[in-house]
Amino acid sequence: RQNTQSSCSRSLSRFQHFVFRKDYSPLHAVGISIFHSIAAFNNAGFDNLGGMHNLIPYKDNILLNITTDVLVIVGGIGFLVLVDIVKQKSFKKLCLHSKVAISMTAVLLIGGTLILKATENITWMGAFFQSMTTRTAGFSTYNIGNFSKAGLFAMCILMFIGASPGSTGGGVKTTTIFVM
């Protein structure tokens, strides 16, 4: 299983290399893509691009947005949920914990996206990315210093909730909020 996860991370890192190689030397682009992929999976969100602009220059880059989305979501869903998905291969057969973690993740992603799209002047892709990364990863494709109070409040709620148990993300956890 670790080989599968490792292969997935390496593949997504290669996709990100295509994005960064336009702005950096080949070796630097490889380093950035590897670092960014690991940070995304681990929900770390470190800005290694300098200048405090994080991923803002890449806000319209579909490839970078999708690979980062996938890595952050997979890292934030929880190891036990991932194992359950691989073993069961059907939502109906998943254990209750996995169903709650997946359902709450979907609700938070969709709800956060709708709220951010309604409160901010950003694209749908940007609203989804910010909703996804706000919960635990901390990446940014928009300057959140320019967001409205309503948008920032929604982001604070998402940060408080965070990721699912057994994941690389923080927060009080999706299952805790579900039980409450």
Task: Put a short name on every predicted segment.
Residues R1-M180:
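Membrane-proximal intracellular helices of multi-pass ion channels
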